[in-house]
Amino acid sequence: MISLLKAREKLLSPLVSSTIRRLSSSLSYSREDSRDSEVLIHPSAVVHPNAVIGKGVSVGPYCTIGSSVKLGNGCKLYPSSHVFGNTELGESCVLMTGAVVGDELPGYTFIGCNNIIGHHAVVGVKCQDLKYKHGDECFLCIGNNNEIREFCSIHRSSKPSDKTVIGDNNLIMGSCHIAHDCKIGDRNIFANNTLLAGHVVVEDNTHTAGASVVHQFCHIGSFAFIGGGSVVSQDVPKYMMVAGERAELRGLNLEGLRRNGFTMSEMKSLRAAYRKIFMSTETVSLSFEERLTELEQDQELYSVPAVSAMLQSIRDSFTESRRGICKFRQWLDSTT
C-alpha cells in the first residue's frame, strides 16, 4: 500500500506543479493587468466627476480636467497640464507640463491616439480671427502619432461650417503656429517657428525650415520644401522648393524626393518637365499657358504619374479663389 501511494504521488507531482505554475502565472498576469488598468490621479489635481477617464490614465499634480472631457486608455498628463471643454483624447496621448488642450466653447476638440502635446503648447482654443462670432461652434480634429512640441499654438476653426484638421505622423517643432481652418495632411515636418496663417492647406510629406511664414489661403503641395526664413505668399506646387523673403521657386526638391523613394527615372522626368515649364529654351517665346499645354501634349513625359500630378498642382493654383504659384526667379521682370 505504501509503495502504491508513493507511486501515485510520483505520478501526480508534475501535474500539481504544473497547475501551481499556471495559477501563479495567471495571478501574476492578473496583477499586471490590474496595474495597467489602474487610474492614478494626484490629490492636487482637479478632475470633474463627469469626465470620462479610461484605463491606466495618469494625472499629475495640479492638472485640471473639465466636465466634458474624455481621456482614452493610457493617457498621461504631466504636472500643471489642463484639458477643457468638449475635448476627447485617444489612447496613449501625453500632455507635457503646462500644456493646455481644449476650450470652453461650442464645438469640440478631437485628438487621436499616441499624440504628444509639448510643454506649454496650446491646442484647440479659440481662433484669433475677428470674424469669429461668439457662440458659434468651432472645431479641431487631429489624427494619430503626431508630435506637437513646446509652445506650439493650434486653433479651432473660425466658423461652424469648417474645421482645423491635422492628419497623422506630423512633427510640429517648437513655437509653431497653425491658425484657424488650416488643413494639414500626413508626415509633414514643420521646423521651429513655422507660422501658418488661416485657411492654409499643406498636403503630405512637406518640410518647412525654421521661421517660415505662409500667407493665408496658400496651398503647399506634397513633397515641397520651404527654405528657412521664407515668406510664402502664393502656392507652392508639388515637388518644388521655394526660398526667399518673398519666396520664389528654386527648382525641384530632389533631395526630398530621393529620401521618399522616388526613382531616378521619375526624378529625371520631373526635371525635364520643370525645364519645359520654367526654363524653356525655345527661340519663340511661349506664354505660360502655352508651355503647360505643350507639356500636356508630350505623351512621353505626361504619361509619368508624378509629372501629370505636378502639372495638375500648377493648374489648380490658378483656379478661382486660389493665389497662383510663387514666381520663378527669372519671371521677376516678366508679366508671366
UniProtKB/Swiss-Prot annotation:
GO cellular component: membrane; mitochondrion
Main location: mitochondrion
Top enzyme class: transferase
Presequence boundaries: 1-32
Keywords associated with the record: Acyltransferase, Lipid A biosynthesis, Lipid biosynthesis, Lipid metabolism, Mitochondrion, Transferase, Transit peptide
Top-level taxon of the source organism: Eukaryota
Phenotype reported upon loss of the gene: No visible phenotype under normal growth conditions, but plants lacking LPXA accumulate very low levels of 2,3-diacylglucosamine-1-phosphate.
Protein localization: Mitochondrion
Catalytic activity: a (3R)-hydroxyacyl-[ACP] + UDP-N-acetyl-alpha-D-glucosamine = a UDP-3-O-[(3R)-3-hydroxyacyl]-N-acetyl-alpha-D-glucosamine + holo-[ACP]
Pathway annotation: Glycolipid biosynthesis; lipid IV(A) biosynthesis; lipid IV(A) from (3R)-3-hydroxytetradecanoyl-[acyl-carrier-protein] and UDP-N-acetyl-alpha-D-glucosamine: step 1/6
Residues the entry annotates as binding substrate: Q128, D129, L130, K131, H180, H199, Q216
Signal peptide: none
Molecular function terms, GO-annotated: acyl-[acyl-carrier-protein]-UDP-N-acetylglucosamine O-acyltransferase activity
One Gene Ontology term from the biological process aspect of the record: lipid A biosynthetic process
Enzyme Commission number(s): 2.3.1.129
Family, as annotated: Belongs to the transferase hexapeptide repeat family. LpxA subfamily.
Subunit structure: Homotrimer.
Function: Involved in the biosynthesis of lipid A, a phosphorylated glycolipid that in bacteria anchors the lipopolysaccharide to the outer membrane of the cell. Lipid A-like molecules in plants may serve as structural components of the outer membranes of mitochondria and/or chloroplasts, or may be involved in signal transduction or plant defense responses (Potential).
Stored NCBIfam families: PRK05289.1
Protein name (database record): Probable acyl-[acyl-carrier-protein]--UDP-N-acetylglucosamine O-acyltransferase, mitochondrial
Originating organism: Arabidopsis thaliana
Gene: LPXA
